[in-house]
Regions:
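Single-stranded RNA-binding regions, centering on S1/OB-family and related RNA-binding modules
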Residues: 1-277
Length: 277
């Protein structure tokens, strides 16, 4: 059986000037001549990907698609049309992302995470609604570092991440610092593996590793203020978040570290770079 949207190994059953047919005598699909390996003969087995051409006919290719049925990938928008956006997925015919499958407004030249599915008309399409395509059986444990792609941003809950393009992950609101958009690539740490297998993430490393990075951020901001920060560790969480993109707890740890190493001093509710020798 020929499977739409999947890579499969099919036998060569007929050879024509314009290409070859692969499959069997009852069900076969055309592999255009330009994709036929040199020296191919009847009976040979070829790995092909099956999709539909511009006339909606089943067609085979030996080119490598960016994703196959049910997989998630980060694809770039080539153009916008009346029916949706067309994505570059490595094949001659671009992949349609219908408007109803878009979760945010997409723009040409930008990349977004999508999954490949078959619509009601038996055509391959892309969807940005990838939640149901993600799995919960990841190999990751607490404190593991992961790579992921942001697929949803919810101001009340946090940032949803497709870990490795396969697994459920989320950065809870309390761990979100800075702005994120759908399609952003992130590196994060697993802080908790939930009972259902979903991963709770943080953009910050463990405290003992993160403190030096936070201290460096504080010093950079101090220098941007000509060496005097107009607030101290007693400032509101909102001010600290706005100025340094970190929590108040992280800021206090960084300030304490800098005080201990005598790189700063605090006076009159201000933080200064320590210029004393």
């Amino acid at each position: 059986m020929i499977r739409l949207g999947e890579k499969q190994i099919l036998n060569v059953v007929r050879i024509k000037d314009f290409g070859i047919y692969v499959g069997d005598e009852e069900e076969k699909v055309l592999l255009p001549r330009k994709y036929v390996p040199e020296g191919t003969r009847i009976g040979d087995s070829l790995e092909v990907f099956v999709y539909r051409d511009s006339s909606d006919r089943l067609i085979a290719t030996t080119e490598e698609p960016a994703l196959t049925l049910g997989q998630i990938g980060l694809l770039c928008v080539k153009e916008i049309s009346k029916i949706g956006a067309f994505l570059d997925w490595g094949l001659e015919k671009d992949l349609l992302l219908p408007y109803k499958e878009q979760t945010v407004q997409v723009r040409p030249g930008k990349s977004y995470p999508v999954a490949l599915y078959i619509d009601k008309s038996k055509r391959l399409c892309a969807t940005m609604k990838i939640y149901d395509y993600l799995a919960t059986d990841s190999p990751y444990t607490k404190d593991a570092m992961i790579q992921g792609i942001v697929y949803q941003v919810n101001p009340n809950l946090g940032v949803f991440v497709a870990v490795d393009g396969k697994y459920h992950g989320m950065i809870p609101k309390k761990n979100v610092h800075g702005q994120f958009r759908v399609g952003d690539k992130v590196q994060a740490r697993v802080v908790h593996v939930r009972e259902d297998g979903k991963l709770e993430l943080s953009l910050r490393e463990r405290v003992e590793f993160q403190i030096d990075k936070d201290a460096a951020v504080v010093m950079d901001v101090l220098e941007s203020y000509d060496g005097v920060l107009p607030f101290s560790e007693k400032a509101s969480p909102e001010v600290i978040e706005r100025e340094l993109n970190m929590s108040k707890a992280a800021f206090k740890r960084a300030v304490g570290h800098l005080l201990k190493t005598k790189k700063i001093q605090i006076d009159q509710h201000k933080i200064r770079i320590n210029v004393e020798k």
